[in-house]
């Protein structure tokens, strides 16, 4: 990162602003649903750059029937014989939907290229076709936002170390993650080449500096909200009805049901 390193965002400031932004995300969601809009948000970046944590905060208060996450596994043997973009197309949103890609078709420009999972010819074909593919999405009316989460090598190393020592997050660390440490510069070159070919005027890349996770989350969400032309949709007027009087119903005896043990009482 260039320039003086910014101070970390205090927790109380972060939580207050995050809640405000999440409230706006709900308004964005209701606009998407009301207008029949289609929104695609691409999250890319190195391992441990903060993509997943940001996605979690984006979707925390959203309706999963409107906003969903697409995190595709490695392609099957059948998918490997298809047009490269084909398996991503089926995850694109219909009217009134938001799709967040936790990694995306840009796998071919990054991990597949660096790790040798695709040929040089396939990689170059991707770089040529990707802008065309994205322009097709835009011409069809899809709103597309692409974010690259940029983490320093020192911060990535520290996050890997914490994952290694944390039994709750240990599953996040894979042999591929560890391999990325020794291929840092190869990934850097791949990222630079990707940006040269795919940072197009119609669908630019937005870089999120992410050594400070709180700052990265706030900055990314605020930018998304600022670049989508949504407006507040008045919610329907709802009133709670009065509960009707009992008609004599009685619950069956408790011993006829199997209840989970009260583990909390033992704490």
PLM features: what roles do these ranges have?
Residues 1-267:
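Glycine-rich phosphate-binding loop of ATP-dependent small-molecule kinases
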């Amino acid at each position: 990162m260039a320039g003086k390193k910014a101070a970390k965002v205090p927790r109380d400031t972060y939580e207050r602003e995050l809640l405000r932004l999440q409230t706006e995300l709900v308004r964005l969601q209701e606009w998407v649903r009301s207008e029949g809009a289609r929104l695609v948000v691409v999250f890319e970046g190195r391992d441990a750059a903060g993509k997943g944590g940001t996605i979690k905060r984006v979707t925390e208060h959203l309706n999963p029937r409107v906003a969903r996450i697409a995190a595709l596994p490695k392609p099957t043997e059948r998918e490997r014989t298809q047009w490269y973009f084909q398996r991503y197309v089926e995850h694109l949103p219909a009217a009134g939907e938001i799709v967040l890609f936790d990694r995306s078709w840009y796998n071919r420009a990054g991990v597949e290229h660096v790790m040798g999972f695709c040929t040089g010819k396939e990689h170059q074909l991707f770089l040529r076709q990707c802008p065309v593919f994205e322009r097709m999405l835009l011409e069809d009316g899809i709103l597309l936002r692409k974010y690259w989460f940029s983490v320093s090598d020192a911060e990535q190393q520290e996050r890997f170390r914490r994952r290694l020592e944390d039994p709750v997050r240990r599953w996040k660390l894979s042999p591929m993650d560890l391999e990325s440490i020794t291929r840092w510069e190869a990934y850097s070159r791949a990222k630079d080449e990707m940006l040269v070919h795919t940072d197009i005027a119609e669908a630019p890349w937005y870089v999120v500096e992410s050594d400070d996770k709180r700052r990265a989350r706030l900055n990314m969400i605020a930018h998304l909200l600022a670049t989508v032309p949504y407006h507040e949709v008045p919610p329907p007027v709802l009133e709670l009805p009065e509960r009707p009087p009992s008609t004599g119903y009685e619950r069956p005896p408790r011993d006829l049901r199997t209840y989970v043990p009260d583990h909390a009482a033992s704490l």
